[in-house]
């Protein structure tokens, strides 16, 4: 900074010294005022920067125009209206109608499949019924074959030789003629109750 020289007034030496003191005080006051003004300007600029940062933290006016913004809330949007609510209701109703139609189509397809499969189910049931009847008949026949044909109560135990019939229980076999004929010699012999063949021998068969 260039030095500025001010002419001193012509007078006594004491007056000159007093003038210099007053001049220096004025210079110091001016420098203090300049420093204070500079500090105030710096503080104002910092406050403005902080306010700008706070404003940037909140959505701008452009966010209202773009629903994709994180801050967008269509219910609080100033552009929201009853027409928008009606439009949403219409969209929901259309979605419901589409869903209902889809359900109805699936229901009809299921009914058709049930109608097609019903005859097959009936055939399977009929076949199962026939098989059951066959098994039942076999069990009945087997039960009859395992029951003594004389008393119709006890289980068969005696196997006749030579015809090989298993048709008598042991008590009924004892009640028959106890004589066993010798082949071609004795005419007084036991005969098979079923085929009337002479019995040459009897074997006790124990069934499980």
Swiss-Prot record:
Q: Which GO terms describe its molecular function?
A: zinc ion binding
What gene, per UniProt, encodes this protein?
EF2
- Basic and acidic residues bias (residue ranges): 72-82
Spans annotated as Disordered: 1-87
Key word Transmembrane helix present? no
| Residue ranges that the Swiss-Prot or TrEMBL entry lists as coiled coil | 83-147
Keyword Ribonucleoprotein set for record? no
Q: Keywords on this record?
A: Coiled coil, Metal-binding, Zinc, Zinc-finger
Pfam families assigned to the protein according to its UniProt record, in alphabetical order: zf-C3HC4_3
> Where does this protein have compositionally biased stretches of type Acidic residues?
22-71
Source organism per UniProt: Invertebrate iridescent virus 6 (IIV-6)
Q: What is this protein called?
A: Putative RING finger protein 413R
Q: Give, as residue ranges, the zinc fingers classified RING-type.
A: 148-196
């Amino acid at each position: 900074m260039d030095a500025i020289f001010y002419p001193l007034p012509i007078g006594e030496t004491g007056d000159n010294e007093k003038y210099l003191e007053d001049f220096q005080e004025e210079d110091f006051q001016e420098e203090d005022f300049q420093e204070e003004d500079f500090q105030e300007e710096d503080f104002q600029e910092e406050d403005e920067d902080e306010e700008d940062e706070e404003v940037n933290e909140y959505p701008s006016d452009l966010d209202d125009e773009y629903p994709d913004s994180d801050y967008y809330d269509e219910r609080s949007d100033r552009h929201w209206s009853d027409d928008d609510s009606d439009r949403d209701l219409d969209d929901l109703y259309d979605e419901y109608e589409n869903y209902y139609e889809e359900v109805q189509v699936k229901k009809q397809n299921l009914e058709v499949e049930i109608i097609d499969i019903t005859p097959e189910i009936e055939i399977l049931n009929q076949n199962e019924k026939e098989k059951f009847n066959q098994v039942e008949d076999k069990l009945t026949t087997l039960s009859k074959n395992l029951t003594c044909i004389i008393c119709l109560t006890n289980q068969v135990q005696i196997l006749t030789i030579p015809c090989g019939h298993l048709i008598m229980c042991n008590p009924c076999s004892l009640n028959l003629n106890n004589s066993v004929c010798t082949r071609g010699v004795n005419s007084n012999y036991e005969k098979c109750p079923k085929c009337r063949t002479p019995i040459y021998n009897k074997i006790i068969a124990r069934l499980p």
